[in-house]
Structures are given as C-alpha cells and as structure tokens.
C-alpha cells in the first residue's frame, strides 16, 4: 500500500497526543487494554483530552479538521469537554499562489481571464482547506467575489479517505462495537459529504434558493450568483459590502440599532425554518456582515452557503409542538410527540419518557423565560432521547447546532434578547396554518389533482393491496426497516470517530513493527 508513510504519520500523531490510551483502554480485548497501559509508561499529558484531540486533528490536516468540526456539532453523542474544544477548530490554511488561481479560472472559463475581468486581485481575501476567495471587477463594472477550489484538493482528500477505509477495516476486526457500527459504510458516507463540499455548483444552487426565499424579507441580503461564469470548480458571485457583525462597536458607531439587529437575526432564522423549511446552517459571525449603505441600512448580509438544512412538514411539526409543550411544561405531550414521531421503539412507556423529559427540562424554569436557550432545550431532549434508543434525525441535529449559533450571536449583540418572545409568533402562526378548516381546505386544494388522477386506478390499487396482504412477506415492514436503516447511517458516522482513531493506531503499529518483519520473511 503506497500510503503506509501517511498511515504511520497519523498513528504517530495520535500516539504522541495520547489518543491510544483514550481508545484502546475501551477496547474489549484484554491484550489491547494492556497495550494501552504499556504505551502510556513514561508519557505524561498535562492538557485535557479534548485539547489533545483538537491538536491531533489540526496536525493531521483538512479532512480531519472537517471531521472534528462535524463531530463538534454532535453534543448529544460526545462529552461536552470534547465538543467545546473541537468547536475551536479553524479551517484556515496558507493561500496558494495567485497564478494557480488565475490558471484555474482560465480553465473554468475556457478563455483568457482578461476577456472577462477588468481586474482580478492577486491576493486572496480568505483561504481555507477547500478553496480561497479573490475579489475582481467584470468589464461591465460589476464587483465580484471569485471562489476557487484548491489545486489537487481531490487527490489529497482521496488519499486520506483511503486511509480511513483501512482504519475502518481494522476496526471491524478489533472491536465488536466496530462491526455493529459498520465503519466502512460510515466512511463511504463521509466520502459523499466531502465530495458535496467540493462541488461549488451545489453551493451556488443553495445560495440561489435562499436568495429566492428571502426575496420578500427586507432584513437580509444574499449575493447574486453569476451562473454563466461559474462551474463546479470556480464560483463567481456578486461582491457584498458591509461590516462584520462581530465588530459591534463599529456598527453602533454607524448608527445601527443593535438590539433590533439581534431580533432580526432570530426572525430571519425562524422564517427560514418554519416558513421555508430551508435554512442557512453555518450562521457563525465569520459568515455574516451588516450593510451600512443608505438603501439597505441595517440589513444582514449572508455569505458561504456550503451547508444548508432542509425540514419537511413533519420536522416542523415536531419542533413547533415540542417547543410549545415545553414552555407550557406539558412534559407528557413532549413524550407523546417523540413516540408519535416513530423514532422511538414501540415498547417505550410514555410515563418513563415523560419522567426523563421532566428531569432535564424542569431546571430550565429556575430562570426567566428570556434566559432560556431553545438550542439547549433541544440538546437536552436529544440527550434524553438517546437513553431510550431514539433515532435522532440528522436534519434536526443540524438545526439544533444552527440554533445555538443564532442564540449565541443574538445574545452577544443584546444580552437582554428574549428569544422565546421572538420565536413564539412563528411557532403559533405555523401551528394555526396546520389546523382548522382553512388548513384542511388548503390541503384538499393542493392534493385534489393528484387524487383525481388516482381515482380511475382505485380498483386496481385495491386489488394489488389485497394480493400483497395475502402474501406471507411483508413489503411494508421491509420498507420500514430500510427507512430506519437510512436514519441510523448518519449517526453511525460520528459514533465511530474514536474507534477510527483506534484503527489508525493499530494500523500504524502494524506498519511500524509487524509489516517489516513480514516483508523480511518474504
């Protein structure tokens, strides 16, 4: 295997940071636990485990940094100290040369850069592991931002993914938990996730959808995508001018109403969630500016659309009813909602789940309503749900992470922000739209054309259903099992992170101590 040097380096980094002790000590094999104790002799680590894991991931490069960033959002799965530390991971790397950027743009455009751009800044304004951004001006005078994929990034990622596959294979051999979690399938899913990020055309489509959705809301601005100049490798968009939202004193000096700005951010988020079911899922301060231009004074400016979340009506109903039941302290209804969702095993007792929900939610009411964190409420519900083998939906985990970001930013702008008072009208409006005669008539109107087409086929469909019921097999059960299997796949991705580290350690030890002897015998 040509990647043995890289595998050995990964194992060395993990060993140096004491990750072997963290993983091997939890392995079921006594020999591996003994190995962990022997390898810890003579080594002292003064930093906490979360710090050591973060430092190891930073040393190992972009794919591991991204894995850590994703893992940091799963506070329902990992200890808080590790999640807090991984949240500090920054995807920043030195820029690549401007002539390489220009060459990539020329290749994407299929013509000299001078034919399209009146000017193209040599120095990038931002640089990350996947891409970097340059400013430029088109010949028609439009100012643009040009996002260019890092050269050879695909090969770099493929090399590390190959090693992840090796680690996953070792994991399946070493650990019963590893076999249960199907790490090779998990690595394949992470592969898909990374390749989605490498497609700038997908990011452009996300931006266009958000811009269209937000068109009637005068609280936010999003850049226009310039489709005829963009591709999967190069994204050209309107350049946006504003003040970074983290520069609060600068915004205050410019005359921005800071408390209103905080409320507007919450309004934007809940509009995206409950009206559109499509939300920007990377709303940290680095991706937000505020306009100070007279015509758009005080509006949010959103950037970077690589991560978005999608919610269907079932997700929105789950959220709205859970929040409303929580603030009414109706914990039985919260428990019933979890069971009605179908994500809880059918054998779960409502009263047991109700008691667990009460235990984690009631302490929140020791403080004023304005100080209650909706993101923390969701997090505690997810943590409680895990004890009852609830399959936490990935889109809801993404929303919970984004909600924490929005809350954090809002309270950074205005410590007195009452998130509940801002969110409550959205929840109540959505619930009112889903019940009553108006909602029923709207549903009938929307579904009437489809049902009209089905009416002539009704006898055949009824006959097929009766025939299927008479068969010994249960296709509906098989379909249900397949759907449940799909829901579990994303959670397995992050449940295996520490076991993958164990696979790397074992692979590195094999490469360093065992493989040379085998080669010598051959």
Curated annotation (Swiss-Prot):
InterPro entries to which the protein is assigned, alphabetical: ABC1_dom, Kinase-like_dom_sf, UbiB, UbiB_bact, UbiB_kinase
Organism this protein belongs to: Leptothrix cholodnii (strain ATCC 51168 / LMG 8142 / SP-6) (Leptothrix discophora (strain SP-6))
Name recorded for this polypeptide: Probable protein kinase UbiB
Pathway assignment: Cofactor biosynthesis; ubiquinone biosynthesis [regulation]
Domain of life: Bacteria
Entry annotation: catalytic residues: 282
Entry binding sites for ATP: 125-133, 147
Statement: the UniProt record of this protein carries the keyword Ion transport: no
Cellular component aspect of the GO annotation: plasma membrane
Role summary: Is probably a protein kinase regulator of UbiI activity which is involved in aerobic coenzyme Q (ubiquinone) biosynthesis.
């Amino acid at each position: 295997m040509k990647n043995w040097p890289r595998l050995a380096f990964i194992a060395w980094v993990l060993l140096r940071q004491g990750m072997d002790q963290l993983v091997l000590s939890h392995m079921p094999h006594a020999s591996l636990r003994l190995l962990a104790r022997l390898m810890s002799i003579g080594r002292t680590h003064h930093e906490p485990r979360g710090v050591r894991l973060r430092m190891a991931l930073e040393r190992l490069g972009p794919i591991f940094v991204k894995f850590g960033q994703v893992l940091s959002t799963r506070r329902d799965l990992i200890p808080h100290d590790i999640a807090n530390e991984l949240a500090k991971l920054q995807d920043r790397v030195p820029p690549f040369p401007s002539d390489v950027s220009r060459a990539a743009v020329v290749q994407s455009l299929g013509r000299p850069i001078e034919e399209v751009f009146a000017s193209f800044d040599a120095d990038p304004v931002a640089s990350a592991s996947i891409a970097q951004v340059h400013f430029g001006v088109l010949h028609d005078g439009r100012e643009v931002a040009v996002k260019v994929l890092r050269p050879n990034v695909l090969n770099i990622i493929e090399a590390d993914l190959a090693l992840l596959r090796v680690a996953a294979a070792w994991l399946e051999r070493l650990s019963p938990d590893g076999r249960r979690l199907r790490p090779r399938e998990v690595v394949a899913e992470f592969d898909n996730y990374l390749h989605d990020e490498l497609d700038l055309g997908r990011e452009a489509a996300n931006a266009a959808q958000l811009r269209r959705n937000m068109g009637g809301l005068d609280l936010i601005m999003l850049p226009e995508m310039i489709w005829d100049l963009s591709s999967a490798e190069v994204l050209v968009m309107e350049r946006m001018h504003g003040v970074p939202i983290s520069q609060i004193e600068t915004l205050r000096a410019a005359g921005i109403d800071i408390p209103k700005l905080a409320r507007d951010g919450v309004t934007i988020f809940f509009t995206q969630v409950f009206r559109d079911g499509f939300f920007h899922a990377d709303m940290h301060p680095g991706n937000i500016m505020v306009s100070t231009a007279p015509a758009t004074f005080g509006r949010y400016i959103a950037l970077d659309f690589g991560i978005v979340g999608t919610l269907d009506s079932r997700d929105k109903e789950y959220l709205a009813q859970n929040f409303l039941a929580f603030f009414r302290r109706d914990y039985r209804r919260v428990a019933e909602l979890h069971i009605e969702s179908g994500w809880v095993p059918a054998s779960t007792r409502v009263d047991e789940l109700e008691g667990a929900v009460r235990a984690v939610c009631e302490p929140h009411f020791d403080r004023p309503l304005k100080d209650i964190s909706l993101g923390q409420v969701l997090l505690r519900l997810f943590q409680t749900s895990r004890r009852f083998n609830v399959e936490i939906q990935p889109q809801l985990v993404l929303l919970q992470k984004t909600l924490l970001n929005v809350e954090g930013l809002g309270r950074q702008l205005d410590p007195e922000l009452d998130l509940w008072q801002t969110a409550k009208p959205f929840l109540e409006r959505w619930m009112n739209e889903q019940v009553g005669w108006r909602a029923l008539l709207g549903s009938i109107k929307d579904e009437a054309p489809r049902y009209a087409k089905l009416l002539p086929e009704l006898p055949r469909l009824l006959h097929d259903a009766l025939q299927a019921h008479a068969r010994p097999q249960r296709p509906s059960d098989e379909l249900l099992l397949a759907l449940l299997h799909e829901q579990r796949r994303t959670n397995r991705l992050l449940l295996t992170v520490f076991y993958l580290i164990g696979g790397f350690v074992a692979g590195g030890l094999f490469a360093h101590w065992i493989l040379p002897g085998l080669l010598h015998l051959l």
